[in-house]
Curated annotation (Swiss-Prot):
SUPFAM superfamilies reported in the protein's UniProt record: ClpP/crotonase (SSF52096)
Key words of the record: Cytoplasm, Hydrolase, Protease, Serine protease
Protein name, per record: ATP-dependent Clp protease proteolytic subunit
Organism in which the protein naturally occurs: Brucella melitensis biotype 2 (strain ATCC 23457)
PANTHER family: ATP-DEPENDENT CLP PROTEASE PROTEOLYTIC SUBUNIT
Amino acid sequence: MRDPIETVMNLVPMVVEQTNRGERAYDIFSRLLKERIIFVNGPVEDGMSMLVCAQLLFLEAENPKKEINMYINSPGGVVTSGMAIYDTMQFIRPPVSTLCMGQAASMGSLLLTAGATGHRYALLNARIMVHQPSGGFQGQASDIERHAQDIIKMKRRLNEIYVKHTGRDYDTIERTLDRDHFMTAQEALEFGLIDKVVEARDVSADESK
């Protein structure tokens, strides 16, 4: 059976640009990377996380002061993979603007709210979902106990991150994340996960640059 990701990548359009050396072709994502646009699309896992972190580090090396734009449409995924992206976002010098299109669930919502203050957006019909981490393990009783302790520590750490970026108190975050909690873009704004709901691009801001 063909890998669905491979199938999608084979359908990625190419963009042809004219340069003083002739024509140059880029896949659409590479071309957008030149504009400092990164996509977090699909499940968050190690391979995707590595690529996103590499792009963040590359754009920092290219210009340590210019804003990076991260577009998110993700159902979430592996916590450690998401934390690698989160830590890299906090580590690099350029501010990272985040925008949710479609959905930002689980780790996707954490990456959304981790954007630079004042630069966290969601499109009008985006859906945001927050919850506590989940996992399963089989083995000896003592090993299961250790894994349970570890996931509880991870839950506390994730709660602390949401507290930091939303301004909500710890108890509110813990209650909200106790079960799957779905929000509209407006509800995410009111909760403090984002700073603005956007329906159309601000043309006046682009023209003033």
